[in-house]
Design a protein with these regions (language model features):
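Non-catalytic accessory regions flanking glycosidase/transglycosidase catalytic cores in CAZymes
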Residues: 1-176
Length: 176
């Protein structure tokens, strides 16, 4: 809505965080917010069960996220508002208020994973995907059109990089 965007612009925010709060964590790891599901043609984006449905009881099953407003649209909004984007990515934990589901970080903590070595540290391949998602988001924002993710951004209509400088990791994680 143009009126809301104009009201936000009048506030002159220095940055805009997205997505907010527990939505990034999901009810569980499977339905966490994943930025890659929010880019590309809007009609081809998957839907996700919304964390704010409170529970998986039948009366809330139709409370979904459509991803019609995805990371690409969010970065465009930040450009319009003339503020820095602060995208937030999941850190491998579900909402700790609801549960304790975590992705094992180190290969030695996982019985099924041989891992990926980075600077002498062996991470589980499952956790490495979170690292790769962050690197891919940076490429989507800052890469030129010859890169995979920079090329997607360019094909969506934004040839110039977004010049991302901030990145949020996780939300209200305790004991992490």
């Amino acid at each position: 809505r143009r009126d809301l965007a104009e009201m936000l612009k009048e506030m002159k925010p220095g940055f805009l965080r997205f997505p907010g709060g527990c939505v990034i964590e999901g009810w569980d790891i499977e339905n966490r917010y994943q930025w890659k599901h929010t880019v590309g043609p809007a009609q081809e984006r998957t839907q996700n069960w919304n964390r704010w449905a409170v529970s998986k009881r039948p009366k809330y099953l139709d409370y979904n996220q459509t991803y019609g407003l995805g990371f690409y649209e969010y970065f465009l909004l930040c450009e319009y508002l003339e503020c820095d984007p602060l995208p937030v990515l999941n850190v491998g934990l579900s909402c700790q208020y609801q549960g304790k589901e975590t992705v094992p970080v180190y290969a030695e903590d996982s019985e099924k994973d041989i891992g990926v070595e980075i600077n002498g540290v062996i991470y589980t391949t499952e956790f490495y995907q979170y690292i790769q998602d962050a690197l891919d988001l940076i490429e989507f924002c800052n890469g030129d059109e010859s890169t995979l993710w920079g090329g997607l951004r360019s094909s969506m209509g934004h040839i110039e990089p977004f010049n991302l400088t901030l990145l949020g990791v996780g939300n209200e994680q305790w004991e992490a």
